[in-house]
Amino acid sequence: MPPKKAAKGKGDPGKAAKKDPTKKAADATFGLKNKNRSTKVQAKIRQIEQNAAASGSKDAKRQEALRKRREEEKRAAEAAKAEVAALFNAIPKKQTPQNFLTRKEEVKESQKIDLYSDVRDQQTDLPLEKRPWINTDIVCKFFLEACETGKYGWLWQCPNGNMTCIYKHALPYGYVLSRDKKKDDTKEEISLEAFIEIERHRLGPNLTPVTEENFKKWSDGRRDRILKQAEERRSNRAVGRSNLSGREYFESNKDKTHEVVGDEEDWDFSALRRETEALAKAQDATAPIVSV
């Protein structure tokens, strides 16, 4: 006959195997206690109960072992984490980044080299009288250039030689580098009227005030002086005693100048001839008469 089909609505057979051992023992001994009081039956019941108890104790031991193993793994993970933190010196969580940066700046400031003292005095064991730089106050130009450009530091080497340079490798006290000087972007501006008043007060008190009458007199005198100078230049030019500059000469002889066209040269000696004749006549007229 084919096996009977499992009734609908009943649980999974596999779940029955997962029942409590005590319940399984009770199911196995159901009816045996009341069926017969023989020794064999009682022994069978005790054996079933012992097996159920042993099965229950195995499950309990397995659970206890699993719990202990998990606790050991947790403790091992915590110990490994603490070892890594101690190895890499991690920053404590209570220390804020701001405090860390402040400490970093303090360390950097303590390692900064002093520009106003010669570090060679700390790096040498020579007596004072044998140090080449001890008898001068002149600052080394290479040292000053390195300070201005920001290249001076603990590893900087002087082109003259650190221990052989005869000049100071230290700035005078109170000296301010050009790169540290604050540029004044705000320039003081004054008005034209204020500038005129300032310049007028600088002239002093012993001056003639400018009036309309004084200005007219000065203007007329200046015009007369210019006309007189022009007349003198014309008279001197007529007698050949011209002291004209190059510019004045060309401006007064524009009609006598010429241009060279192509490769041909056109020389006009008429002007030169007239000037030579005028000069000769002037010399003859001014020559003293000698009696024979």
Curated annotation (Swiss-Prot):
Subcellular location: Cytoplasm
Any one of the GO BP annotations: cytoplasmic translation
C3H1-type zinc finger span: 134-172
Any one of the GO CC terms: cytosol
Alphabetical UniProt keywords: Cytoplasm, Metal-binding, mRNA transport, Transport, Zinc, Zinc-finger
GO molecular function, one term: zinc ion binding
Segments for region (Disordered): 1-76
Signal peptide: none
Domain of life: Eukaryota
Record carries keyword Protein biosynthesis: no
InterPro entries for this protein: ZC3H15/TMA46_C, Znf_CCCH
Predominant localisation class: cytoplasm
Amino acid composition bias (Basic and acidic residues), ranges on this chain: 9-26, 58-76
Record function comment: Functions as a component of the nuclear pore complex (NPC). NPC components, collectively referred to as nucleoporins (NUPs), can play the role of both NPC structural components and of docking or interaction partners for transiently associated nuclear transport factors. Active directional transport is assured by both, a Phe-Gly (FG) repeat affinity gradient for these transport factors across the NPC and a transport cofactor concentration gradient across the nuclear envelope. Involved in the export of mRNA from the nucleus to the cytoplasm.
Protein name per its UniProtKB record: mRNA export protein 33
